[in-house]
């Protein structure tokens, strides 16, 4: 009934193949395959082993479907519905694993905190639908500026956090500048025409500048606000003198 499920159906090997598709939600979720010696076994449709396997598949499908649904729900809970990016909950749930891997490899994580400049004006002038478009387009631009192995998190509102795993020294600043310049040049198409925006970015590297990952995020955020104070549309790297200022503590 499903000749394309298993390529062994079309093979010329001197073996007997029986493949039982596991169909859940109208889709094939897996295949159980039996391999028999033709000389010692003949299939008549009533073999007990195949029958038991079919019964097992039927009984287990509901459990498999339930687990898949739970995984889907769990994944959706970790993603921002607007941009499709991971959210802060993902960061909270998976930070320990990320940090352990980086420390084991004796590498650094580059952190880039990004915030769209004067984003509130977009919502006020054009409405929230246009604001949503700007956020989605910004997320796509950032994706194109970083490596596929890097992570982007919608940290809140118009703020994005980029985590660059196993980054070489100096590369964080280069990527941050690439993001800044690309967004500055971008023309975001909306229903009423085109919008141009700029972005401010603060950077920090873990564990180079602090042994606490969450403090590294704080440091990147402090650098971001220094970029805002210095006129926006800038990349600022965190320095220890920023943390010493009471304003940020």
Feature annotation, model-predicted:
Residues 151-154, 195:
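A short pre-motif secondary-structure segment
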Residues 74-93, 114-128, 136:
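Conserved nucleotide-binding and Mg2+-coordinating catalytic segments in signaling enzymes
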Residues 116, 130-151, 159, 183:
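Active-site-proximal alpha-helical element of nucleotidyl cyclase-like catalytic domains
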Residues 35-55:
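Regulatory loop-to-helix N-cap segments in sensory/regulatory domains
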Residues 15-23:
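A short, aliphatic-rich beta-strand micro-motif
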Residues 1-16, 244:
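Signal-transducing coupling segments at domain and membrane junctions
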Residues 173, 191, 206-237, 242-249:
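Catalytic-core segments of nucleotide cyclases and related cyclic-nucleotide turnover enzymes
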Residues 94-126, 140-142, 153:
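Active-site-proximal structural segments of metal-dependent nucleotidyl cyclase/transferase enzymes
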């Amino acid at each position: 009934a499903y000749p394309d499920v298993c390529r062994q159906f079309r093979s010329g090997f001197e073996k007997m193949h029986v493949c039982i598709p596991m169909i859940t939600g109208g889709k094939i979720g897996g295949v159980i395959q039996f391999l028999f010696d033709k000389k010692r076994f003949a299939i008549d449709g009533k073999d007990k082993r195949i029958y038991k396997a079919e019964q097992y598949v039927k009984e287990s499908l509901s459990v498999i479907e339930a687990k898949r649904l739970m995984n889907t729900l769990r994944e959706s809970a970790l993603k921002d519905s607007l941009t499709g990016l991971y959210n802060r909950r993902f960061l909270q749930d998976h930070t320990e694993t990320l940090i352990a891997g980086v420390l084991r490899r004796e590498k650094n994580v580059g952190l880039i905190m990004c915030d769209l400049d004067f984003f509130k004006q977009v919502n006020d002038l054009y409405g929230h639908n246009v604001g949503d478009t700007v956020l989605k387009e910004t997320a796509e631009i950032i994706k194109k500026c970083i490596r596929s192995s890097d992570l982007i998190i919608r940290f809140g509102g118009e703020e994005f956090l980029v985590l660059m795993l196993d980054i070489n020294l100096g590369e964080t600043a280069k990527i941050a500048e690439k993001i800044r310049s690309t967004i500055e040049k971008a023309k975001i198409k909306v229903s009423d025409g085109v919008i141009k925006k700029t972005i401010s970015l603060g950077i920090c590297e873990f564990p180079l500048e602090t042994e606490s990952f969450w403090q590294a995020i704080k440091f990147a955020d402090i650098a971001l606000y220094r970029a805002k104070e210095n006129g926006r549309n800038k990349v600022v790297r965190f320095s220890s003198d920023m943390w010493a200022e009471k304003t940020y503590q």
